A protein has these predicted regions:
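Sec/Tat signal peptide C-region and signal peptidase I cleavage site
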Residues: 28-32
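Active-site histidine-acidic residue metal-binding/catalytic motifs
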Residues: 33-113, 146
Length: 238
């Protein structure tokens, strides 16, 4: 995750007045580039402790079941590529994890949502890959929050729009089967989000062909380009 760059203050004389050069150069918050929060799913080590699926909920889910075989590594690799593309386009980027382990806060999906919330993300991109006992299953799908008063009602319209735009771009970039959009009410990372949030299942790790593609850097760049283009459609640069 790129850190804020320090600015060396200089002084400029103008009509007998000293002005801070840095103050002249710094963009106002209104013109700052949108921040995209990339959330590579899972960790190398599962975390089976429980957390509420939404604020005040009596329903609990495990924080991290580990995902499909190899998923955590693949989505991190794609996340790095996506970060490069977005930074090159002029976006600001934050990543929930840049190593094998997510260590922010109390970990889990509440912490992932809070990480993006506190940075005021224009979009939270949750990167995942699918798994199935049926090894013939393949394709890309994008999940978005279901409506729930007090949880997702404020982010649902924008999240659904982002899901549609990103799904179309990833399918076009990869040629993968289009499995469409999926509305989910039970995902902790959605229910605690205060910013538009979507989850992209970038393919099936359990399909021999698709799983092999997802592990290959060339295909990962295709996925990342689709994600970047869809993000650009949803959050144009000022």
């Amino acid at each position: 995750m790129p850190s804020a760059e320090g600015v060396k203050l200089g002084e400029v004389k103008f009509a007998g007045t000293l002005l801070a050069a840095a103050a002249l150069a710094l963009p106002s918050p209104a013109t700052a580039a949108p921040l995209i929060c990339i959330d590579p799913g899972h960790d190398a080590t599962p975390d089976l402790s429980l957390e509420r699926i939404g604020p005040g909920s009596t329903i609990y889910k495990i924080k991290d079941g580990g995902g499909a075989p190899g998923e955590a590594k693949v989505v991190l690799q794609i996340g790095f590529k996506l970060r490069t593309l977005l930074l090159n386009r002029g976006y600001r980027v934050a990543m929930t994890r840049t190593t094998d382990e997510f260590t922010y806060g109390n970990r889990g999906n509440i912490a992932r949502a809070r990480f993006c919330n506190r940075r005021g993300a224009a979009l939270m991109l949750r990167l995942h890959a699918d798994g199935s006992t049926d090894s013939s299953r393949h394709g890309v799908s994008t999940l978005y929050p279901a409506w729930h008063a007090g949880w997702t009602d404020d982010i649902l319209p924008q999240s659904r729009r982002a899901a549609r735009l990103v799904q179309a771009r990833v399918v076009a970039a990869t040629g993968a089967k289009d499995l469409g959009l999926v509305r989910r009410a039970d995902l902790t990372g959605f229910n605690w989000a205060n910013v538009p949030a979507i989850l992209i299942e970038e393919g099936f790790m359990t399909n021999p062909t698709e799983g092999s593609r997802l592990r290959h850097p060339r295909y990962q760049w295709k996925v990342a380009r689709g994600l970047a283009r869809g993000t650009g459609d949803f959050v144009p640069l000022p």
